[in-house]
Regions:
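Extracellular glycan-modifying ectodomains
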Residues: 1-411
Length: 411
């Protein structure tokens, strides 16, 4: 009986929004008919396909209005979310979203074959040896996964994120590659997913990225004798928090809507100590070149607008992903030059790591197709340390191939 009532309510909402959409479209048609415009034009550009009563401009206007109203779709997505929540639905295989048992949303990760994992791991081994042949240090960083333990997904939903990452880490450790695994660090420190990740998105929070940059700095002090760790840079007392409550609807939340998922707070730690940073994204169009303090260099305020379906709030840091970034911090205590092979977790990680050292260059192999990582290393012998920092959802051929350029569409 409960499900029947919910279904009836849902259908009434559908009828209401459908009628409203139809009225808006009819008003547009009526307004258009009042205008003395030519009434017939071939929509397809051929003489045998004509729509009497409308020219192309009229048709396009109505089409856009239908799209705007039907695809004023956050209403429909939220309505569907209310319905799905009322029905007790905990996931959608086609849209790839799932409600974990801890109340957070996540997608599932496919199983990579042992052969694929071995190939990707050996690619990392070869890259480490190549970097070391140029006198550079190398570090592979396994970033955390939102699902920390088995049994978090709804019954019957498989996920292989941690299994895939374990397969790569096992080989790297057997080959004596320098590694650090944030999954283990978080487990040892009892840092739970609920406090460290967004509920509606797959990424970690900026506060977690700040902490992670400090852990990475400690590890770099072990890898590179010239790197000095500065604990004050991870001390929360040296940051003010810019609070944005109930602002962020993450990528997974957008699939089911805020009525189902809710929205996350988006809080940004901003250094209160002095720093002067130049942040560049060199490209032919829409290049970025900003110099100033941390906030001026890294924070894109347009992505902090309260428009959850259209704005990617996570991209408030560095305006999201880029093929290549170059950072120079003249105030940094370390004079080291880092090459960071990154995924989207470094949108927030890299700015905090940049507080520790003078130069960081990042390459995102999903977007960087200019040359291979090997070629980049050959051309930049001034690099001190090469870091590959990936979370388990980044295990793809495109991101684990360093000696040639991989275009995803050709895979």
């Amino acid at each position: 009986m409960r499900n029947r009532i919910i279904t009836v309510i849902f259908l009434c909402f559908l009828l209401f929004f459908g009628v409203r959409t139809g009225m808006n479209v009819w008003d547009s048609i009526s307004d258009t008919e009042k205008e003395n415009q030519p009434q017939t034009e071939a929509l397809s550009g051929t003489d045998d396909m004509k729509l009497s009563g409308f020219n192309r401009e009229t048709f396009d206007g109505i089409s856009n209005l239908v799209t705007l109203n039907l695809a004023n779709r956050n209403q429909w997505i939220n309505l569907n979310g209310i319905f799905q929540k009322g029905m007790g639905k905990t996931g959608d295989l086609e849209k790839d979203w799932y409600l974990l048992k801890n109340g957070m949303l996540m997608y599932s990760q496919n199983k990579d074959s042992d052969e694929e994992l071995k190939k990707y791991a050996n690619n990392v081994v070869n890259l480490s040896q190549f970097a070391e042949s140029y006198g550079m240090k190398f570090l592979y960083v396994e970033l955390p996964y939102k699902v920390q333990r088995d049994g978090e997904y709804p019954t019957g939903v498989p996920d292989y994120g941690n299994r895939n990452a374990d397969g790569i880490m096992e080989i790297l450790l057997s080959k004596s590659v320098q590694t650090m695994d944030f999954r283990d660090i978080m487990k040892d420190k009892n840092i739970e997913t609920e406090e460290s990740f967004f509920r509606t998105d797959q990424h970690w929070k900026p506060e977690t990225a700040l902490w992670a940059a400090g852990e990475l700095s400690k590890k770099l002090a072990q890898v590179d004798s010239e790197w000095k760790d500065y604990p004050e840079y991870r001390n929360s007392n040296n940051y003010r928090i810019e609070y944005h409550s109930n602002l962020f609807l993450g990528a997974i939340g957008k699939k089911i809507g805020s009525a189902y998922a809710g929205k996350d707070d988006f809080n940004m730690p901003i250094p209160i100590f002095e720093n002067t940073i130049r942040y560049r994204v060199p490209r032919q169009e829409d290049s970025i070149d900003r110099t100033g303090d941390f906030e001026t260099a890294f924070i894109e305020s347009n992505n902090l607008k309260n428009d959850p379906f259209k704005v990617n709030t996570y991209a408030a840091y560095c305006d999201g992903d880029h093929n290549k970034e170059q950072v120079t911090n003249e105030s940094a205590p370390n004079q080291r030059n880092i090459l960071l092979i990154r995924d989207s977790f470094s949108c927030t990680l890299m700015p905090y790591l940049a507080l520790y050292t003078k130069n960081i260059t990042t390459l995102d192999l999903r977007l960087y197709k200019t040359k291979t990582v090997y070629d980049y290393i050959r051309r930049h012998p001034d690099i001190d340390t090469v870091i590959v920092a990936y979370n388990p959802s980044s295990i793809t051929e495109e991101q684990y191939t360093f000696d040639r350029v991989v275009n995803e569409e050709n895979n």
